[in-house]
Amino acid sequence: MLRAIAEERGRLSLRREVCGLGCFKDDRIVFWTWMFSTYFMEKLAPRQDDMLFYVRRKRAYPGNEGTIDGRKAEAEPEVEVEVYRRDSKKLPGLGDPDIDWEESVCLNLILQKLDYMVTCAVCTRADGGDIHIHRKKSQQVFASPSKHPMDSKGEESKMSYPNIFFMIDSFEEVFSDMTVGEGEMVCVELVASDKTNTFQGVIFQGSIRYEALKKVYDNRVSVAARMAQKMSFGFYKYNNMEFVRMKGPQGKGHAEMAVSRVSTGDTSPCGTEDSSPASPMHERVTSFSTPPTPERNNRPAFFSPSLKRKVPRNRIAEMKKSHSANDSEEFFREDDSGADLHNATNLRSRSLSGTGRSLVGSWLKLNRADGNFLLYAHLTYVTLPLHRILTDILEVRQKPILMT
C-alpha cells in the first residue's frame, strides 16, 4: 500500500511537469477510490478499527464581501471529517465529488494502518559532544484527528484535522520519573511503523533544555504564590502545573510538556538516583554533532492582576519574556554554552529542603533570584500536520535515535 501511494505521488509530480494541473483529475479519482475500497472497505486486518473516515470538502460561496473588482473571489472549501461504521448504510458513494479521496486514503492510513511509539528522555551532553541518556520512557500512542485540553479532564473533543494529535491522557503516571535538573535537557521522539514492523520512520523530534523550561515555568507561576512560599519559610508548597509547548524543527508540529516543580520533600527515585559513571542510566549512545538548543521566543507571560506590590523593572522585563517552548532547529545541535555535566549531579545530591532556614536568612533572601530546582517534565501530546507525517513516512524515513 505504501509503495503504491509513493509511486502515485511520483507520477503526480511527473505529470505536473509535463501537462500541468487538472488534465488527469479523473484518472486520479479512479486510483484513490480504488485504494480506499481495496485497503479499507474490503480488507479488514485483525486489529483494524471498524470506523471509516471521509474528508469532505464543501464548496463555499462568498457573498458581496468576497468580491474583487466586481468579480466573486474563489472561496476556500470548508473541510469536514465524517466518520462512519464500516457496515453503515449511509456511507458516501465511491466517486462522490465532494469527498477528497486522496486525503481520505491518507487519513485512514495514518489512523489505522500504522503504529506509533513516543519516547521521552532526559539527557546531558559531554564536552566532546556525546549524548548521555540518563533515563527514558517509551509509550505507545494513537493518532487522532481530534483533540481535547490536557489541563482539564472530561471536556469534549474538537476536530483538529488536518493536524493529527498523539495524546497521552495518563501523562503523570506514564512519565512519573521524568525529572530534569540543571545542565540536562528533555528530548522527545515519535516513531511510526507499519503493523508488521518492517519499517520505522521518525515523524517528530524535539528538545528543550532545563534552563529554558525553568525560565518559562518561573514566568508562568504567580509571583504572589512564590512570595507566599518564601514568607512561610518553606512550609507553603506551590504545586502548580504549567503546560509548555516545544516546537519541532523548522516549525514542524509541536509537543506539549506538563511542567511542575518537584516537591522539596519528595522521596521519589528522582532525588536519589545514582549518577556515577558506572550507573546504567549513563548509557553511552552514539556521538551526535548537533545537540538540541532551543531558540528564544518572545511572547507575553501571565501576570496576576491581584498583585498590588510594586514590581521592580527587571522583574517586569522577565515576566514579559517567553512562556512557550523554543524551536528545536535540529534534534541534536551543537551548543556554545558549554553545559557542565557536574551541575546535574550536584543538584540531585544536595538537599532541596527549605524548612531549616532561619528567620533572618529567609528575610534576606526574599528579593534574591530563586535557585535551581528539579522540574517534572511530563509529555502530554505531540501534534503534526497530516502532510508532514506522510512525507516522513513515504520519503524521508529517518532512523530513530532514542529508541535504539
From Swiss-Prot:
Biased composition (Polar residues): 262-278
Database matches in Pfam families: DUF2045
Comp. bias (Basic and acidic residues): 319-336
Highest taxon, organism lineage: Eukaryota
Presence of keyword Transport: no
Modified residues (Phosphothreonine): T290, T293
Location of Phosphoserine modifications: S268, S276, S279, S304, S306, S324, S358, S362
Record keywords, A-Z: Phosphoprotein
Keyword flag Transmembrane: no
Start and end residues of each stretch annotated as Disordered: 262-307, 319-340
Secretion signal, residue range per the UniProt entry: none
InterPro entries membership: DUF2045
PANTHER family: KIAA0930 (PTHR21477:SF13), ZGC:172139 (PTHR21477)
Protein name listed in UniProt: Uncharacterized protein KIAA0930 homolog
Organism (species): Mus musculus
Lineage: Eukaryota, Metazoa, Chordata, Craniata, Vertebrata
